[in-house]
Every structure is written in structure tokens, then in C-alpha cells.
A protein has these predicted regions:
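A broadly tuned "polar low-complexity/structure-edge" signature
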Residues: 2, 17-20, 102, 231, ...
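N-terminal secretory/membrane targeting signals
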Residues: 2-29
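Transmembrane-helix bundle segments that line or gate the permeation/cavity pathway
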Residues: 18, 26-244
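Membrane-water interface at loop-to-transmembrane-helix junctions
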Residues: 163-170, 243-266
Length: 267
């Protein structure tokens, strides 16, 4: 039997829905971002994806407990070079290059095909870096432009506020979602002037965040591109002075939580 409270609640829900429907208005839409052209035959993509999924399922079915851990153990290497001073210089070079690209975006040609900023951002950085970071070496830690300026301007800076570790990388999830929204919903993400303003604003946000919460904490938990390339680097076979099969770092580093999973889904 329906009670008077249940009937009143149903009426309230339908009343709210009706008010929302009556208050709707037409909205503007656009064609979103351009599609990616598959240069290889489509059959190659389909076959590669099918084989990958099939092998993954077979591995999960027939692999004995602990067998994967034994196979994925890395082999220690006998050398480990200290490259910290050289990395500081390379990051400073990366910051200088980013500043020049932003200047080119603001003052250069308005045609995205003729301006260097969109070409470098969307072709070199957003595509080529993924391959290098995942297969060859940790390129992002060498050219990351964000810590370089902060290190130069505030070499002896003290943290103003502590970023709680329990937040994990949820702040980076929010920033990555905002970035993906810019790429997908903006009417002209390739426009040099618009892209330069976005890059400059994000650089200022990152510099301010590192000033308040500290360089290491901000880059590890909030700066979405540092988090992105750190996760991609977990696929790489080599790390520091160890070498193993692709993915061994994922088994060694078990500090990932739900925020990391959501971050990967957003990508």
C-alpha cells in the first residue's frame, strides 16, 4: 500500500522534473575536435587489439598464483649514474623552450598549420612523448619545465601549507578532466593564441601551487601531466638501475588506489 508520504514524494519528484523540462532552452553545439586518421590499415588495429585481449584472458585463466610475480622480477644492473645537476639544466632548457613556444603562439602566425606551438604541443609532446616515455626512458623528468622556474626563483622556499597525502592524486584527476574538457569541447583548441593563453595560465597555476604546497607534493599529487607521464613510465622496461619485462613496475609499486584508476579512465 502506498502511504501519503510516498505519494507526496512522487508528486514532488515529478513536479521538479516537470519544472526542469519547462525551463529548458535550445543550446549551441559544435563539431568538437578533429578525428584522428588511422594511417595503418584498420585490420592491423583490430587484429592487434583482439590478440592483446585474448592473450590477457588466457594469461589470467592459466597462470598459477604467484607465477606472474616470479616472471616479472626485475634484474639489477651494476651501474647507476648520478645525473641530478644535468637534469636541472635540461629542465631549465625545457622551460626556456616552452616560454619561446608561448611567445610564438601569441605573436606568430594565426594558422595552426604554420605556427610552431600547436605543432609541438599536439604532435611532438602529446603523441611522441607518450611513446618515448613508455618504451625508452623517462623523458619528462628531464625536460619538465615547471620545477625549473620555481627552483630558480625560490631555491630556499618553505612550504606554506601541507598537501594531505590522503588526497592521493584526486586533484590531478580534476585537472586532467578539465584539460580533456578543453581539448574536446573548446571550439578551437588548435588556435595558437588560445593555446598559448592556456599554457601560460596553467604554468602560472603550477608555479603558484608549488609555492604554496611545495614543489614535490604539487608535482606528485596535483600537476596532472607529471602524474600522467609517471604512470605511463610504469610500462617501461628500465628504471633506475633495474631492468625487467614491460609492466614489472606496476607489480613492484602497489601504492595505486581508486584515484589512479579514474585518472587512467579519463585519459
Amino acid at each position: 500500500m502506498y502511504t501519503n508520504k510516498m505519494i507526496s514524494f512522487v508528486k514532488l519528484v515529478f513536479g521538479v522534473l516537470g519544472a526542469i523540462m519547462l525551463g529548458t532552452t535550445p543550446v549551441w553545439a559544435h563539431a568538437a575536435n578533429q578525428g584522428f586518421v588511422l594511417l595503418l590499415p584498420t585490420t592491423a588495429y583490430i587484429a592487434g587489439g583482439t590478440v592483446t585481449v585474448a592473450l590477457t584472458i588466457l594469461l589470467l585463466i592459466f597462470a598459477k598464483p604467484g607465477a606472474i610475480d616470479a616472471v616479472m622480477q626485475p634484474v639489477p644492473l651494476r651501474f647507476r649514474a648520478s645525473t641530478l645537476p644535468l637534469r636541472d639544466w635540461s629542465q631549465s632548457t625545457g622551460a626556456l623552450c616552452l616560454a619561446l613556444l608561448i611567445l610564438i603562439g601569441l605573436r606568430g602566425p594565426t594558422d595552426p598549420q604554420a605556427n610552431l606551438l600547436p605543432l609541438v604541443i599536439w604532435t611532438v609532446w602529446w603523441m611522441l612523448f607518450f611513446v618515448v616515455q613508455a618504451l625508452i626512458f623517462d623523458l619528462w623528468s628531464w625536460i619538465n619545465p615547471f620545477p625549473a622556474v620555481h627552483r630558480i626563483l625560490m631555491s630556499e622556499h618553505r612550504v606554506i601549507l601541507n598537501l594531505p597525502s590522503r588526497l592521493s592524486i584526486w586533484p590531478a584527476v580534476v585537472l586532467m578532466a578539465a584539460f580533456q574538457g578543453f581539448v574536446l569541447a573548446d571550439t578551437a583548441p588548435n588556435d595558437p593564441d588560445r593555446l598559448a593563453v592556456f599554457a601560460l595560465g596553467y604554468w602560472a597555476l603550477t608555479l603558484g601551487g608549488m609555492t604554496v604546497f611545495g614543489r614535490e607534493a604539487w608535482l606528485k599529487q596535483v600537476e596532472c601531466f607529471s602524474v600522467l607521464f609517471a604512470l605511463i613510465g610504469l610500462i617501461r622496461m628500465g628504471r633506475s638501475n633495474r631492468l625487467g619485462l614491460p609492466g614489472w613496475q606496476l607489480l613492484q609499486d602497489r601504492d595505486h588506489d581508486l584515484s589512479h584508476a579514474i585518472f587512467v579512465v579519463i585519459i
